[in-house]
UniProtKB/Swiss-Prot annotation:
It comes from Paracoccidioides lutzii (strain ATCC MYA-826 / Pb01) (Paracoccidioides brasiliensis). CDD domains: OAT. GO terms for molecular function: glutamate N-acetyltransferase activity; L-glutamate N-acetyltransferase activity. Keywords: Acyltransferase, Amino-acid biosynthesis, Arginine biosynthesis, Autocatalytic cleavage, Mitochondrion, Multifunctional enzyme, Transferase. Catalyzes two activities which are involved in the cyclic version of arginine biosynthesis: the synthesis of acetylglutamate from glutamate and acetyl-CoA, and of ornithine by transacetylation between acetylornithine and glutamate. The record marks 162-163 as: Involved in the stabilization of negative charge on the oxyanion by the formation of the oxyanion hole. It catalyses: N(2)-acetyl-L-ornithine + L-glutamate = N-acetyl-L-glutamate + L-ornithine; L-glutamate + acetyl-CoA = N-acetyl-L-glutamate + CoA + H(+). Pathway: Amino-acid biosynthesis; L-arginine biosynthesis; L-ornithine and N-acetyl-L-glutamate from L-glutamate and N(2)-acetyl-L-ornithine (cyclic): step 1/1; Amino-acid biosynthesis; L-arginine biosynthesis; N(2)-acetyl-L-ornithine from L-glutamate: step 1/4. This is Arginine biosynthesis bifunctional protein ArgJ, mitochondrial.
Length: 473
C-alpha cells in the first residue's frame, strides 16, 4: 500500500518529507527548491529589513538546464551607501572579485548603490572577456538605477558570481534579466527571500536573516540589519569563504565600515569550515545607507562603534553558522572550542586544524567517539608556539546539547573510561561541542584565564562525495 506524502510551502518554497540522511541538492542544475524537513526551521517566514534597501531575484538561465528558476539577484539602496568588502585570498581571483575591488577603490568605499549576483557560473579563470562581462553587469545595474557608469569614478554596483569555474557567463541572458529584476525590486520579505534563493547553488535552503537593534546614542531609535549568504561546499576561511551580503540602515562612514566588517568576519566567516577548500569567488560585503538617521559612526572612537561591532559580529556569526548547517551532505553541526591557550592565534589554529580533519569529520558522521583523531589533529597543528600543546596538560571532552555533564575523553593527557553507549547517544544529536583545554592559560602564575579559539564545522558523509563527484554532470 502506498503511503501519502504531505507537501507544504514555507516562505514560498516547496517542502517535503525526506529520510533522515537524504537531502535535496541542486548539484549543478537549478531546480525546484525542495527544502529538507530538518532545514525548514532555518527559513524565516517574515523579516524586518533596513530602510531604503530593496531586493529582487530574476530568471536568466545562466545554466541552459535552468529554464525557469531565479538565478540573478539584486540588492539596491534608494540612496548611495558606504560599503566595504572582504575578499578571497585565492590567487585565482574571479572576475567579479577583481571588478568589485576596483569599484570600492575608485569610490573609496562611498557612493555605492548596490550589488548584483548571479549563480550557476563563477566567471572565474575566464580572462579579459570575463572581466568585461563582470563590468557590464555592474554597468547595467547602474543604467537601471539612473546612475550611468560613465562618471569619473566608474561603476557604483558591486558584482558577485558563484558556480562552475572556467566557463564564460551567458552575458546576454544576464543583461536581459537585470532590468527584470530591477523592475521587481521591493522591500518585502518575499523579495528578500527571492534574492536569497537566486544565489543558491548546492544549498538546500536560502540563508537569510534580519534583526532590529538600538545603539547607545539613541536608545529609543530602532535600527535594522539584514543579510544573506550562499555556500555549502568549497568553504574554508581565508577570507571570506562564500558569498555574503549584509545591509544596515545605520549611518556609518567608509572609514569606520571597513574595520567593523574585518573584525566581524575574523570572528564569523573566518571561523567556519566544511571541506577545507577556499573558493576563487569568496566575498562578503557590507553596505550602510544611513536611512534610519541618527549619529554617524565615523571612527572606532565614535560612541556607537563598540555597540555596532557587537551587533555586526553576532549577526555575522549567525549567518556563517547557517552555511555550516547546510554543508554538503552534512548531518552534524559541530562547535570546537579551544581553551587556555597562550594566544588566541594558537587557539584558532588548533580549532581550525580539528575542523579541517577528514578523519575527525568522518568519525563524527559514523557516530564514533574516536578522540584519538582529535588529539592527532591537535598534535600536527602548524604555526603555533613551542609549548602551546603539552600532552600532559591537554584535556578533551564532548559537551552535549542537552546541558548534561560533559563526557570526558582525555584529562591532563590521561585517557578516561568512556561510556560508549552515552557517547553514541551524544553523537546521535545534530549539534555537538568539542572542548579542548590546553591547560596552559595561566599568565605570570596569577591564574588568569588563557585565550580561546572557536570554529564551527560539519561532518563528512557519503553524500558529500556524491555531490562533488557529480557537480558538473
Amino acid at each position: 500500500m502506498k503511503t501519502q506524502q504531505s507537501f507544504h510551502v514555507v516562505a514560498g518554497f516547496v517542502c517535503f518529507p525526506m529520510s533522515k540522511t537524504s537531502q535535496s541538492r541542486c548539484y549543478s542544475t537549478l531546480r525546484d527548491f525542495l527544502i529538507p524537513p530538518s532545514k525548514q526551521k532555518f527559513v524565516p517566514s517574515s523579516g524586518t529589513y533596513p530602510k531604503g534597501f530593496l531586493a529582487a531575484g530574476a530568471h536568466a538561465g545562466v545554466k541552459e538546464s535552468n529554464t525557469q528558476f531565479r538565478d540573478v539577484a539584486l540588492i539596491c539602496s534608494k540612496t548611495p551607501c558606504s560599503a566595504a568588502a572582504v575578499f578571497t585570498t585565492n590567487k585565482f581571483q574571479a572576475a567579479p572579485v577583481q571588478v568589485s575591488k576596483q569599484v570600492l577603490e575608485a569610490r573609496e568605499g562611498a557612493d555605492i548603490t548596490g550589488v548584483v549576483i548571479n549563480s550557476g557560473c563563477a566567471n572565474a579563470v575566464t580572462g579579459k572577456g570575463g572581466l568585461e562581462d563582470a563590468k557590464s553587469m555592474s554597468a547595467k545595474v547602474d543604467e537601471c538605477n539612473g546612475t550611468p557608469s560613465t562618471s569619473s569614478k566608474g561603476p557604483s554596483t558591486l558584482v558577485m558570481s558563484t558556480g562552475v569555474i572556467g566557463r564564460r557567463l551567458p552575458i546576454k541572458r544576464i543583461l536581459n534579466a537585470i532590468p527584470v529584476a530591477h523592475s521587481n525590486l521591493s522591500s518585502t520579505h518575499k523579495a528578500w527571500l527571492n534574492a536569497a534563493r537566486s544565489i543558491c547553488t548546492t544549498d538546500t535552503f536560502p540563508k537569510l536573516l534580519s534583526r532590529t537593534f538600538t545603539l547607545p546614542s539613541s536608545p529609543n531609535h530602532t535600527y535594522r540589519i539584514a543579510g544573506m549568504t550562499k555556500g555549502a561546499g568549497m568553504i574554508h576561511p581565508n577570507m571570506a569563504t562564500l558569498l555574503g551580503i549584509l545591509c544596515t540602515d545605520v549611518p556609518i562612514s567608509p572609514a569606520a565600515l571597513k574595520p567593523l566588517l574585518s573584525h566581524a568576519v575574523s570572528r564569523s566567516f573566518n571561523c567556519i569550515s566544511i571541506d577545507g577548500d577556499t573558493s576563487t569567488n569568496d566575498t562578503v560585503a557590507l553596505l550602510a545607507n544611513g536611512a534610519a538617521g541618527g549619529q554617524t559612526i565615523t571612527t572606532p572612537s565614535s560612541p556607537n562603534y563598540a555597540a555596532m561591532q557587537t551587533v555586526l559580529t553576532s549577526f555575522a556569526q549567525s549567518l556563517a553558522q547557517l552555511v555550516v548547517r547546510d554543508g554538503e551532505g552534512a548531518t552534524k553541526f559541530v562547535t570546537v572550542r579551544v581553551l587556555n591557550s597562550p594566544s588566541q592565534a594558537d587557539a584558532r589554529a588548533i580549532a581550525s586544524t580539528i575542523a579541517r580533519s577528514p578523519l575527525v569529520k568522518t568519525a563524527l558522521y559514523g557516530r564514533d567517539a574516536n578522540w584519538g583523531r582529535i588529539l592527532c589533529a591537535i598534535g600536527y597543528t602548524q604555526g603555533i608556539q613551542v609549548g602551546t600543546v603539552v600532552p600532559e596538560r591537554t584535556s578533551v571532552s564532548f559537551k552535549p546539547v542537552d546541558g548534561s555533564e560533559e563526557l570526558k575523553l582525555l584529562v591532563n593527557g590521561e585517557p578516561q573510561m568512556v561510556n560508549e553507549e552515552r557517547a553514541a547517544r551524544i553523537l546521535q544529536d545534530e549539534d555537538l561541542e568539542i572542548v579542548v583545554d590546553l591547560g596552559g592559560g595561566e599568565k605570570g602564575g596569577e591564574g588568569m584565564a588563557g585565550e580561546e579559539g572557536i570554529y564551527w564545522f560539519c561532518d563528512f558523509s557519503h553524500e558529500y562525495v556524491t555531490i562533488n563527484a557529480d557537480y558538473r554532470t
